[in-house]
Amino acid sequence: MSCLPALDKFLQNYHQAYLTSLGELPRYYPQGEPSVCIQGEFHADLDQAVSWQPVKREVEGSFANVEHALELTLWPEINHFYGQYFSAPLLFDSKWGTGELLQVWNEDDFTCLQQNLIGHLMMKKKLKQPPTWFIGLLDEGDKMLTINNSDGSVWIELPGEIPTQQLSPSLAEFIGALSPRIAPPVKHEELPMPALEHPGIFASFKRMWQNLFGKR
């Protein structure tokens, strides 16, 4: 079952929750990065939050280059989850705790996602662990949410370790179990690492990537 209907519904509920509770669209700190998601004026030189809404991509994002580089077939849901929309990260509440689903802010962000996905999968191979790919963070970034690439199930994963706790048999069921979390925008700190320049995804990964790559 594709995760796209569940993602479509969550995005609709997400924005409706903000409109109902706050009377406004969700806001996000783009940190100078443009996006078709931005509603209203945008000034790259101003450090301010912008209102945003998801925009469906005209052409689906593809991970064929990642598959070719790693000689690995990725679970097809990766194209539905990351390739359909431009969007800010999506905050959620769940029975497993609070967290966020990662999304792609613009094309540069998508390129960074691919680069860091390659890094993650290479690390898994180096550690002789089964391949996974990340979809989000749980508990303020202390835990990764990852997909088992062999069957599409959703797991909690700590950097450098094999996932031990399965949350859902599929990404569609996992997204369907989430509720939008209403919160003010938070400005993330920039990391002093070139691969993490784009805030749409990788500011959210600051603790994870420091743990994963900072000690090599």
Swiss-Prot record:
Domain of life: Bacteria
Record key words, sorted: Cell inner membrane, Cell membrane, Membrane
Subcellular location: Cell inner membrane
Membrane-topology annotation of the record: Peripheral membrane protein
Entry-linked InterPro entries: Syd, Syd_sf
Family assignment from sequence similarity: Belongs to the Syd family.
HAMAP family registered for this protein in UniProt: Syd
NCBIfam families listed in its UniProt record: PRK04968.1 (NF003439)
Protein name per Swiss-Prot or TrEMBL: Protein Syd
Species: Shewanella baltica (strain OS195)
